[in-house]
Amino acid sequence: RPDFCELPAETGLCKAYIRSFHYNLAAQQCLQFIYGGCGGNANRFKTIDECRRTCVG
């Protein structure tokens, strides 16, 4: 899996409410979080399937 899958979920600096998914290293699965719309990091996916393909598979 790519190194960015190990980064923590980051909401970012903006105040939007965008349902997103990230890989949670401790839980070893993709989990939902709310993204603010700007900033953050690469451990952010639009769908849980995209997260799983990238970080779990």
Curated annotation (Swiss-Prot):
Major subcellular location class: secreted
Pfam family membership, one: Kunitz_BPTI
GO cellular component: extracellular space
Cystine crosslinks: 5-55, 14-38, 30-51
InterPro entries named among the record's database cross-references: Kunitz_BPTI, Kunitz_BPTI_sf, Prtase_inh_Kunz-CS, TFPI/VKTCI-like
GO MF entries: serine-type endopeptidase inhibitor activity
Annotated PROSITE patterns: BPTI_KUNITZ_1 (PS00280), BPTI_KUNITZ_2 (PS50279)
Subcellular localization(s) per the UniProt record: Secreted
Keywords on record: Disulfide bond, Protease inhibitor, Secreted, Serine protease inhibitor
UniProt note on tissues of expression: Expressed by the venom gland.
Residue(s) at site: Reactive bond for trypsin: 15-16
Annotated BPTI/Kunitz inhibitor domain residues: 5-55
Recorded family membership: Belongs to the venom Kunitz-type family.
PANTHER family: BPTI_KUNITZ INHIBITOR DOMAIN-CONTAINING PROTEIN, KUNITZ-TYPE PROTEASE INHIBITOR-RELATED
Name under which the protein is recorded: Kunitz-type serine protease inhibitor 2
Native organism: Hemachatus haemachatus
Taxonomic lineage of the native organism: Eukaryota, Metazoa, Chordata, Craniata, Vertebrata
